[in-house]
């Protein structure tokens, strides 16, 4: 009996980050009770961390990002590693609390970056869920689009800043 419970649990947990895994993410409810905020997170330049410092450091980065996500969001929602360097949080919080939690996450990640020089930046997008106005799937897609929009914007600004420095 204990083995069966352990086996079921390990099928739902990502072994590296100890967050819920993609299987759990894909079996999440199609609707949520009340308002929620869905965050999509992606580790910036993760491939270069792996290529430069090795997969051991890359794994440590993912574990640290997962730990930071859990520390900030676990009391208000579900935290998932959905694959590679992508994470999702479904938080049962109000729209007005969304910025507060995002700020807390970024502050915590910055504090951890001081201790771990390999910890890169994380791009985050989020969208608010209102059961009477949209589906969970639509909100997830919006959050994902916002995250990629932010990531492209950062790369564009970095290129512009580098071009300015070179000239």
Task: List PLM regions with ranges.
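Signal-transducing coiled-coil linker helices
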Residues: 1-16, 20-35
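Conserved long alpha-helical elements within nucleotide-processing catalytic cores of c-di-GMP signaling
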Residues: 21-37, 44-74, 80-84, 88-89, ...
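A structural signal for short, well-ordered beta-strand segments
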Residues: 38, 87, 122-126
């Amino acid at each position: 009996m204990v083995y069966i419970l352990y086996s079921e649990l390990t099928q739902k947990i990502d072994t590296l980050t100890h967050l819920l895994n993609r299987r759990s993410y894909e079996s999440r409810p199609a609707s949520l009770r009340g308002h929620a905020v869905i965050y999509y997170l992606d580790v910036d330049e993760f491939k270069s961390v792996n290529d430069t410092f090795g997969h051991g450091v890359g794994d440590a980065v993912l574990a640290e990002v997962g730990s930071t996500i859990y520390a900030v969001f676990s009391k208000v929602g579900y935290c998932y590693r959905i694959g590679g360097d992508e994470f999702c949080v479904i938080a049962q919080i109000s729209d007005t609390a969304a910025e507060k939690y995002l700020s807390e996450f970024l502050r915590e990640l910055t504090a951890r970056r001081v201790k771990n020089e390999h910890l890169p930046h994380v791009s985050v997008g989020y969208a608010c869920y209102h059961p009477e106005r949209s589906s969970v799937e639509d909100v997830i897609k919006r959050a994902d689009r916002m995250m990629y929009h932010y990531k492209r914007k950062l790369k564009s600004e970095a290129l512009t800043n580098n071009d300015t420095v070179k000239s």
